[in-house]
C-alpha cells in the first residue's frame, strides 16, 4: 500500500498506462490477423478489389506497428519482427497469384 500521495498517483498513472498499452497491443494483433485473413481472401479470389483491400489493410497494420514502437508500447525488434512476418505473407501471396 502506498503511503505518500505521489506514490498513490504513480500507481494510478501506471494502471492507466498499462490499460492504454494493452489496448494498443490488442489493436496491433487484430490488424495483423486481418492482414492474414486478407491474404487468404486474395489467394482464393485474386482481383483488383481484393488486392486494394489487401494493400489498405497492410498499410494500416504497418502504420499502427510503427506508432506502437514510437510510443514505446512495443520494442523496436518486436515491431520489426511483426512487420517482417506481414511482409513475408504478402510476398508469398503475391508471388503465388502472379
From Swiss-Prot:
Single annotated GO MF: structural constituent of ribosome
GO cellular component: small ribosomal subunit
Any one Gene Ontology BP term: translation
Segments crossing the lipid bilayer: none
UniProt keyword terms in alphabetical order: Ribonucleoprotein, Ribosomal protein, RNA-binding, rRNA-binding
Any matching Pfam family: Ribosomal_S20p
Keyword Nucleus part of the UniProt annotation: no
Highest taxon listed in the record's lineage: Bacteria
Gene3D superfamilies assigned: Ribosomal protein S20
Family the entry assigns: Belongs to the bacterial ribosomal protein bS20 family.
HAMAP family, per database record: Ribosomal_bS20
Its job: Binds directly to 16S ribosomal RNA.
Name of the featured protein: Small ribosomal subunit protein bS20
Source organism of the structure: Prochlorococcus marinus (strain NATL2A)
